[in-house]
């Protein structure tokens, strides 16, 4: 990713656009073919020289063209014919975004493979599901990971759509009318650069493309933050059902030698906020004055390289996190039983209803016994067995049958089968 956003690659991509435009103009007879051969043979640039000229004239694209012209000589007069600065800048930028997107898609595919493997590994590992942070009903740890896998598959498709949205080029002149350039030049350059022509433009391609792209990066970052946040919760000392890999020589605190902190997960959550934060300036870049102002440019020079680079990094970090995640099934089972069977209250309720009890009334019977467990530590199962209202409908054996997590997980295979697993 660093190579894609390297300044040398940026200018080289712009030079590739300029040379392709010269080739197209030569086919149209606007440039001598011999001149194009000279341009292709001699065209080069020195980054420091571009900066030197830019400091004097305060226009980076003209500085670039001047620096290239010093290498090419007289034939440089044919470079940039009929084009405006954004013709080359926008088209080259979208080539770089295409390259960055390929990296991000590959990252996502690696993450998906790791998630799939670990989901299958813990397919039948029972754990407690939590809603509002409170014990709810049993699930499996494999289902948790399968959820992340499913979301990652969607993110791969989102990323492909976003990359396609950005794979457009624009060489239509100062206000998008092709006043001084033939539309064929745009078609030729875009085909050569792996893009399609923007169907209508002003001086720039419209920034709704970029807003959709950056928003997609933010959605993907949200998935990664969700994975990392779950690990952070599960690694809390009083939970410790799973935790980040901790290397033998790793240290968790400068003051507390005992510490094993979820630093990678915290880093992922933090950097996800950074990626998501770029959605706002991307939205604000959409409205530009008339046929174009330059307010979007300074934002994009920071936003796009930074967002793609940050996402590339946290995708790699998340893949490593999941791949090496330490999982403790025994602690998961211990925590599942922590509430003394309160998590089976839905099964007791349904058993009562199936025997003819009115639902709201049965709910109150089960709830009053559950509250005794919550508030006074009394045995939930024994209290149910002693409850006269409950016993009118359920035998002690029928109540006992409710206290089993296995029937609550009988459809795990069916859910996995939806993914061919």
What are these regions (language model features)?
Residues 121-124, 158-161, 165, 195-199, ...:
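Conserved helix-loop functional segments at active or binding sites
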Residues 143, 211-219, 347-355:
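Short, well-ordered beta-strand elements within core beta-sheets of diverse protein domains
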